[in-house]
Amino acid sequence: MKQKLLYTLTATMLLSGQAVQAGSLENLERERALTVMEMIDGELSAAERWEKLSAAKRRLADLERIVLSDKKLQGKASQLVQRSFQSFELTFLAHASAEKQRSMQSHWMSEVGLSTDELLSTRVSR
């Protein structure tokens, strides 16, 4: 019994000692995905959505600055890095929408090919 407990404690200590670190780009992608989920969440009221997206815009802008100044990403040939910088308008959502003087929601929707007319012509079904 004691030996089993000792093995369990040793395994737990070894596994918990390995810290998982996400890079700056991965953190940006995670935050951007959460922001897009908030944009399209049908359960939020307009006031709740505005409040959440205002906070998200500040977080995204900070994370985008971190990614743009991250020296580790320069010259890195991973697919994530290449794809992220090729689709600048979607990856760097806060900066791209500010450059075009549009809200993040309208900028994202236009970049993925959705228009107001298309959205208004759809019907909600569950």
Question: Can you describe what each PLM-predicted range is?
Answer:
Residues L53-M104:
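Long, amphipathic, charge-rich alpha-helical segments that form helical bundles/coiled-coils
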Residues V20-R58, S121-R126:
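Immediate post-signal-peptide N-terminus of mature secreted/exported proteins
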Residues T8-S16:
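Bacterial N-terminal signal peptides
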Residues Y7-L9, L28-E29:
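Short helix-onset patch at the extreme N-terminus, typifying the N->h transition
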